[in-house]
């Protein structure tokens, strides 16, 4: 990836000066209600946040019922579930030490390599897979048991499809078509769409499927092997993703797809190009209710999605209600907060705090587009995160006395808090473990766990989930410090953060609407729960020191 370097100022401390305000109590969600009257004024800030990267103040989002825990997904692989270092050849059982880590997160984006489940053309295997001997059934069953949503991302192309290309251009990231086929024709993507049908038939919720269309390979690989069993409607998956970063600009020519070509790809994947590709092709042919997620876009370019919509209007037409017959249910992109700009391919030198990046602006663009469409498809961010190795342009740096790991934790949690403000419905961090422990390249050391222990970022996610995972974001009442209000029924929680990366601190007076006490919850590295303490209020108000680590406050009577 190409990023731009630019200067980053040294850390300084800025103080916020408080104004005394007369607050009026009101139950109305209007500007005269108490929660809108929390105010703070600040001295000049060296890291000014552009207005387009700031949330609107006092805009009520109470119709948004997305729980905060939906912002705490993770990316992972089969071996994260099944590979026990004490018994590396046993892939029939969940490795419970790792599962304890995975349960920290609300969702798992599973990188499902197509070659694992269709090692030879037309022969589908799931338990065990012919490639690797993995038990996909067990992984999905355990995730459902533990309340973890799974997004199965069918990605890369299998060896037999690669082998249709000349040796010099074979790449498992090639577009999912045989060599020489048109990338503009949905029929060229029929092989991948057949694979999608088999996945949706097996793991979806529709049990009324013509069994003659199920093509599970039941042959044993050797004597004593456990054969695959053809199953349908197991009720384990609700979401499936078509590829990964198909808008890539790196790699060979065969790895690239335009927006129109990817729309043709998704049209086949979605419903067999409206059924034109025959039986047993496309997700919706197997389970009409399974949600098809667009492959995460590397460029975070909302225009790419608009071009896909335009292709659908031209090639798939309109529904009876006049809306475009889209080939996706969920809009999906990737964005890593740094001081570059992926949209312009400007090179970065370092990761930066999410609020200082383009993340808010980009999220706003995607959500605005989604809300302009009938049905308002959800917007997800399925890759984001920070490295801990200091050679990476995506690194989290140490700030003041705060370690790199502690700062990674702050920025990870603040990333979730940012995206829920803008209406993104789910976030998945990259990734559970380091891709290359000790590596120095970008994305090599982005793991949120290490060995069988959580890193601080995962500590913060677990603690926040336990405190208020079911709460929904209501509004932001201050931009600096950031003060967000969340609710669950008649309970209210405030989250306060300095949106900076200079070790800045501030005092802030929070009006809790007449509450006699405040319960203040502070994140703690290495713990399962936050530290909590009660403090008396003064006429329902409490003055807090706010830092770049979020603090959580609720009123008590």
Language model segments and positions:
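Conserved, mostly hydrophobic/aromatic
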Residues: 108, 143, 199, 240, ...
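Bacterial N-terminal signal peptides that target proteins for export
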Residues: 2-10
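N-terminal substrate-binding region of glycoside hydrolase catalytic domains
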Residues: 36-228, 232-235, 241-242, 247-253, ...
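Aromatic/acidic polysaccharide-binding cleft in carbohydrate-active enzymes
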Residues: 385-461, 481
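Noncatalytic carbohydrate-binding groove/subsite architecture in carbohydrate-active enzymes
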Residues: 210-226, 258-412, 422
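C-terminal beta-strand-rich structural cap/linker in extracellular carbohydrate-active enzymes
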Residues: 531-557
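Carbohydrate-binding surface patches
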Residues: 477-524
């Amino acid at each position: 990836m190409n990023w731009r370097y630019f200067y980053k100022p040294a850390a300084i401390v800025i103080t916020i000066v408080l104004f005394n305000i007369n607050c009026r109590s009101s139950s109305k969600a209007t500007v005269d209600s108490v929660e809108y009257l929390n105010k703070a004024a600040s001295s000049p800030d060296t890291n000014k946040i552009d207005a387009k990267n700031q949330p609107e103040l006092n805009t009520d989002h109470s119709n948004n019922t997305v729980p905060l825990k939906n912002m705490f997904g993770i990316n992972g692989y089969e071996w994260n579930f099944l590979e026990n270092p004490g018994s590396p050849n046993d892939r029939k059982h969940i490795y419970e030490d790792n599962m304890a880590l995975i349960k920290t997160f609300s969702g798992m984006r599973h990188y499902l390599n197509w070659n694992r489940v269709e090692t030879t053309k037309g022969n589908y295997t799931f338990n065990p897979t012919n490639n690797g001997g993995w038990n996909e059934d067990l992984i999905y069953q355990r995730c459902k048991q533990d309340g973890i949503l799974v997004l199965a991302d069918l990605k890369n192309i299998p060896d037999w499809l690669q082998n249709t290309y000349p040796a010099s251009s074979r790449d498992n990231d090639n577009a999912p078509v045989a060599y020489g086929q048109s990338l503009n024709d949905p029929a060229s993507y029929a092989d991948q769409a057949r694979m999608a049908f088999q996945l949706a038939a097996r793991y979806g919720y529709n049990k009324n499927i013509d069994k003659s269309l199920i093509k599970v390979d039941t042959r044993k690989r050797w004597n004593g092997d456990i054969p695959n069993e053809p199953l349908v409607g197991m009720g384990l998956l609700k979401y499936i993703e078509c590829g990964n970063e198909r808008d890539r600009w790196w790699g060979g020519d065969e790895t690239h797809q335009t927006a129109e070509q990817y729309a043709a790809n998704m049209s086949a994947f979605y419903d067999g190009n409206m059924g034109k590709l025959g039986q047993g092709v496309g997700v919706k042919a197997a389970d009409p209710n399974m949600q098809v997620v667009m492959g995460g876009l590397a460029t975070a370019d909302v225009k790419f999605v608009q071009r896909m919509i335009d292709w659908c209007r031209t090639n798939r037409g309109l529904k009876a209600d006049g809306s475009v017959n889209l080939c996706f249910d969920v809009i999906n992109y990737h964005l890593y907060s740094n001081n570059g700009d992926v949209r312009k391919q400007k090179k970065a030198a370092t990761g930066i705090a999410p609020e200082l990046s383009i993340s808010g602006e980009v999220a706003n663009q995607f959500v605005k587009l989604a809300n302009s469409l009938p049905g308002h498809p959800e917007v997800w961010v399925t890759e984001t995160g920070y490295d801990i190795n200091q050679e990476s342009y995506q690194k989290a740096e140490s700030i003041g006395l705060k370690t790199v790991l502690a700062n990674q934790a702050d920025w990870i949690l603040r990333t979730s808090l940012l995206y829920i403000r803008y209406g993104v419905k789910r976030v998945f961090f990259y990734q559970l473990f380091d891709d290359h422990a000790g590596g120095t390249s970008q994305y090599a050391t982005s793991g949120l766990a290490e060995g069988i222990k959580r890193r601080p970022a995962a500590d913060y996610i677990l603690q926040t989930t336990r405190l208020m995972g079911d709460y929904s974001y209501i509004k932001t009442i201050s931009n600096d410090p950031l003060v967000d209000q969340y609710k669950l029924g008649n309970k209210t929680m405030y989250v306060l953060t300095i949106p900076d990366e200079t070790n800045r601190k501030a005092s802030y007076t929070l009006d809790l609407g007449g509450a006699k006490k405040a319960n203040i919850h502070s994140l703690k590295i290495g713990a399962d729960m936050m530290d909590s303490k009660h403090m008396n209020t003064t006429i329902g108000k409490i003055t807090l020191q706010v830092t770049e680590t979020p603090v959580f406050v609720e009123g008590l009577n």
